[in-house]
């Protein structure tokens, strides 16, 4: 892992350079001075999606969901708890496909919920269907580790 990481602020979407050893719960954005780590998933829209996927040095796990989807609503608390467990190693984010159908179309989302793991803009893996917190954590760690071994 790089000694300096790029980490996108979940509030103002400014890219911050942070020493890997300093990426803790107390790291703040250099622009808006709010915490970089939220302990929960961040909401992405069409404007913030690319910036968060392309500029993060860390993997980003995106939950493509919709408010009318029962399994999506059922999985939401598990996804939020998984975010608290996986941060700062994997950033968790959510995209409302009803509000942002262009993102669902661009990434060929055919069923929801669908989890897609990205690293520096490249899709590493995807899973369709609701998962428990432990399954989300296990799956994302396994896919992230598999991708890092393939890259080395």
Model-derived features: where do they sit?
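Short cysteine-rich clusters marking metal-coordination/redox-active sites
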Residues: 9-12, 29-32
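Cys/His-rich microdomains that often coordinate metals
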Residues: 16, 36, 76
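Short linker/helix segments within small regulatory modules
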Residues: 18-27
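Short Cys/His-rich micro-motifs in 6-15 aa windows
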Residues: 32-41
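A short beta-strand-turn-helix
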Residues: 41-60
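Short pre-active-site segment immediately N-terminal to redox-active cysteine/selenocysteine motifs
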Residues: 57, 64-68, 111
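Thiol-based oxidoreductase modules, predominantly thioredoxin-like and allied folds used
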Residues: 64, 75, 79-83, 87-102, ...
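Non-catalytic, surface beta->alpha helical segment in thiol-disulfide oxidoreductase systems
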Residues: 111, 116-150
